Amino acid sequence: MALPLSLATPALASEASADTPKDLDKVEVRGRAQTLYRANDAAVGTRTDTPLELVPQSIQVVPRELIDDQAARQVTDLYRSISGISFFSYAGVTLRGFRQENVLYDGLRGDPYAGFSVPQLFNIERVEVLKGPAGALYGGGDAGGVINYVTRKPKARAERRIELQAGDKDFRAGSIEGTGPLNASGSIRYRAGLYADSEQGVRWNADSESVIGDASLAFDVGQTGELVLQFTDITQNLGGNRLRGVPVNDAGSFLTDRRWNHNEASDFLDMRAKVALAQYRFAPRDNLDVDLAARWFSNNEHQMYHEPMGLIDRDRDGVAEWMTRQLRNQIRDNTAFAASGNAVWRINTGRIEHKVLFGADVYQLDADFTAQTANSADLARGAGPVRGIDLFNPVYGASTWHDYNLAALPWRSTATRSKRYGGYLQDELALGARWHVLAGLRWDGFKDQDRMGGGSVDGNDLSWRLGSTFTVRDGVNLYANIASGFVPQSATSQNPAAGGPFDAERSRQWEVGLKSLLADRVTLNMAAYRIDRSNIVQATGEVIGGVNQLAALGLVRSTGMELDLLADVTERWVVNLTYAYNDARVKDAGPNGITNASGDRFANAPRNKLGVWTRYDLPSINSAIGFGADHVGERVSLDGQTVKAYTVFDMSWKTTWKQWQFQANVKNLFDKVYAASGFIERNGHFPGEPRRVYVQAAYRF
């Protein structure tokens, strides 16, 4: 479903294009004059410049304007504006009923934030979401969809901006960024930015510090070419982390204060990532466009935290009040390289117009994991046991990881190499003014190696999709698609100690929908779908030898519908509404599945989700006010505990004075106590943020 939300961003999956710098700026200005949140195209669905209304697949684009209006610092702040997506844990989401963490950056695989840090938005121009099958184009594609982060690139027009932010919980942030030409002709352009923030967390003992540095250069090459080079450095230090949830009863009510933390103040999660990107686009002929891209990143994450292992009734009063704990010292080192090459050839065969895409990509990830575990009853270390923590009256600091003689503990390690590679062919056919057909085929290969034990798992398969769009009348388009999917299991899930190896995941989806633009003021998009996925690996919640156990569900079926509405109610008033209904259920647990899971709902998949964001401009005082609401229906956790429905509200005020812009945002306006998602019983539910207040001032020069 294609809800255009962008500030007229360029068509390609990256901000750069083969157009001249002057043309780039013209496109942006024209889009801002038309509407605040609408995009007309985004190549993430086809890797071509096909208009969104002609793509037989659901696509949503969240632009920078919407990110700024909502004072969104990380991607979790944007879920209300994307139908069918909700929070699962950390960077993971539920998309069309399924948990998924696979993301793209500028159309290439690899997440520098790994699995336990949440992607930040400082250097992100827009967020693109493909709903439904993406494997036939990107490989390794989850059937629910894929998220693509488009990073900011150099512009031809000089812009400089300084911003300061403050808020409750001692939140402080500042950034400086600039972009523009480096020479008189504008053939060399730059962008540089630096962002830093810090705050005391909403959970006891928790705090955070982040620093992001980003620099890029763009060079005109010949008459049609553009080369972009980019480097990003990310540092994130989280105190009192890794965070788990807060224990609940089976009805989903928190058993204690939502601020409760199982970690000590000395616990931490420190992450450092570096990313390098090179993109080159050119047009050797009028009907042929070529783009090449390569991306490298490294990620180092060190976690030292107390894992909650379950409540016991220590004082025998009939109430389980003591959370037993385990100390985990974990180090993850990831290094990855991704590359892709694409060519788009426009030809005619008789009266039929073809837009033929052919390309290939490759991805390699080296993942090293080293860990120690200290248990409560483990006295061989010659040090005190790992103390638990009281649920109702926690006393922090009675012991820390310094007291556990970790030097006496053995290390366990894994080292894997995951390779993904594929080639694809796609044809978009215009069979006249009203009828368009899209057909795509992709071959995928993979190889996962145990670099310590020497074992390996490899395989290959074909994925395909077929879709069609029919224009009923100007501004009203009907579409349908069917697609198959093939996703290799991650290298870590092949570990025999965790229950592996497992066969590759397979999927198939059927989708129909409507895309419409009414009176040039109202965009209404609807979709209905059914997705069958088999052999989905999930955590069972069981720990054997310090290793989290996995199991494969035989078949899960997700059915649902989505509605996206973007309306320019007046010249001053914009309304963005998203609604999704989903029913994801386990149909067959399979021979090695979770016991008695057949027929149960899939974890953290709400049946109903509604998001609203509206903005009203007050031109007489150069201001705008915004109001948002986010409703997520009842869900179940991984262990079947209820996760209650919730509704939260936000407000914002933005005003400009000369070159200054001032903004205030209130999130969770009525301080609703709620669970954002559920996990396993001993970990509890992840509490949603309490009311937060942010103010900021920005100066452009």
Where in this protein do the model-derived segments appear?
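Outer-membrane beta-barrel translocator/receptor signature
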Residues: 122-125, 136-213, 221-225, 274, ...
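Membrane-embedded beta-barrel scaffold of Gram-negative outer-membrane proteins
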Residues: 279-283, 289-295, 299-307, 471, ...
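Structural signature of Gram-negative outer-membrane beta-barrels, strongest in the C-terminal barrel
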Residues: 220, 334, 353-365, 412-533, ...
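Acidic, small-polar-rich N-terminal luminal/periplasmic segments of exported/outer-membrane proteins
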Residues: 23-158, 512
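Surface-exposed extracellular loop regions of Gram-negative outer-membrane beta-barrel proteins
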Residues: 235-250, 366, 469-511, 523-524, ...
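Gram-negative outer-membrane beta-barrel transporters
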Residues: 433-434, 530-532, 551-639, 673, ...
